A protein has these predicted regions:
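Conserved alpha-helix/loop element of class I SAM-dependent methyltransferases that forms part
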Residues: 63-82
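Conserved SAM-binding loop of SAM-dependent methyltransferases across substrates and taxa
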Residues: 91-104
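S-adenosyl-L-methionine
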Residues: 120-153
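A conserved beta-strand element that flanks and buttresses the S-adenosyl-L-methionine
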Residues: 164
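A short, conserved alpha-helix within the catalytic core of class I
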Residues: 171-184
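Conserved class I S-adenosyl-L-methionine
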Residues: 191-217
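Short alpha-helix
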Residues: 230-247
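C-terminal lobe and adjacent flexible extensions of AdoMet/dcAdoMet transferase-like proteins
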Residues: 257-324
């Protein structure tokens, strides 16, 4: 979930060598040709990254993250004056870019159910406070709440121009919870914008990320108490089907192929290939059959990484969509 800069959306129509997965509904894909005046220049990534709390040793990581989110928000056409509801804001990496995009006349309500002390090396509370103290901080209102509870609470009559779920779908405890959230958003937001990993790799070096995500998802679904970043690794088709069931219609969809600066694939593959993953399986899984499946899944990740012969693991494709 960190930055591909100026890379354009690549679709199967534009690249016939990519195997097309089954699609729920074929729609127009966003391209540079139909961008609006709301486009944020990639050159602003450094400034936007400064709004977020960053380890002094790794400024490039935060810049890459900002670049990626600039790409997403440009695809969605979010701009000055928009009232945005962000579901699953986490530490606010997307929030910072949204706040820049909406300008002084717009606003961002950023909702996340995680406790304030969640996260490392910085907690949710620390990261959000840093953004609040930045040049765009007064455009953001943080809500530490379950999204559905928030929508049914004192904000029961509030409406937004757009609701955003940027790399937050996989954090949901289940597809049922996602469906309930999307139903609650219907009638409250004019548009729904979703970005999530696509479970496909246009770059061969991203294959280990796909395998690692599936392995992690299988492990985390063994525990109802999991708070890991991959609990519901839904495919684009599955997300679109859930959205359709909640009353949403696909407006546009396409793929972003991340550049090498987006390191999530590298991190996720490394996590699954590590011995700590083996210990997690031993601690959390009692069924021998499931242990065997997870051992094989980890083996596939290790083998895929070794096949790269030292090349760094890339991050898988990202599905970018909007609904009305």
């Amino acid at each position: 979930m960190r930055g591909e800069g100026k890379r354009n959306i690549i679709t199967t129509r534009e690249n016939p060598n990519i195997l097309r997965p089954p699609q729920l509904n074929e729609c127009t894909n966003t391209s540079a040709a139909n961008m609006t005046e709301n486009t944020i220049p990639a050159s602003m990534a450094g400034r936007i990254a400064s709004y977020s709390i960053t380890p002094p040793s790794a400024p490039d990581i935060e810049i890459a993250q900002a670049e990626h989110r600039i790409t997403l928000i440009n695809r969605w056409g979010i701009g000055p004056g928009h009232r945005v509801l962000e579901i699953g804001c986490g530490q606010g990496n997307t929030t910072a870019v949204l706040a820049e995009a909406v300008g002084e006349t717009g606003s961002v309500d950023a909702v996340d159910p995680a406790p304030p002390d969640y996260g490392a090396p910085f907690t949710l509370a620390q990261a959000q406070a840093h953004i609040s103290a930045s040049a765009v901080g007064d455009r953001v209102t943080w809500q530490n709440a379950d999204p559905v509870a928030f929508l049914r609470s004192g904000s029961a009559t509030a409406t937004w121009d757009v609701a955003v779920l940027a790399h937050s779908v996989w954090y949901f405890a289940s597809s049922a919870v996602l469906a309930e959230t999307l139903r609650a958003l219907r009638g409250r937001a004019a548009r729904l914008c979703v970005a999530e990993y696509a479970l496909r790799a246009s770059e061969a070096a991203a294959a280990p990320h796909v395998l690692a995500a599936v392995a992690r998802g299988v492990l985390e679904c063994q525990s109802a108490e999991s708070t890991a970043n991959i609990r519901s690794p839904l495919s684009p088709d599955a997300i679109a089907a859930i959205a359709a069931g909640a009353g949403w219609t696909v407006e546009r969809q396409g793929m972003v192929v991340p550049g090498p600066g987006l390191l999530d694939g590298h991190w996720e593959a490394g996590s699954v290939a590590s011995q700590s993953f083996v210990r997690e399986v031993e601690d959390a899984v009692r069924d021998e059959g499931m242990r065997l499946v997870l051992a094989s899944a980890r083996y596939a990740v290790v083998a895929a990484v070794e096949a790269l012969k030292g090349e760094r693991v890339r991050t898988m494709d990202v599905w970018v969509s909007s609904f009305t």
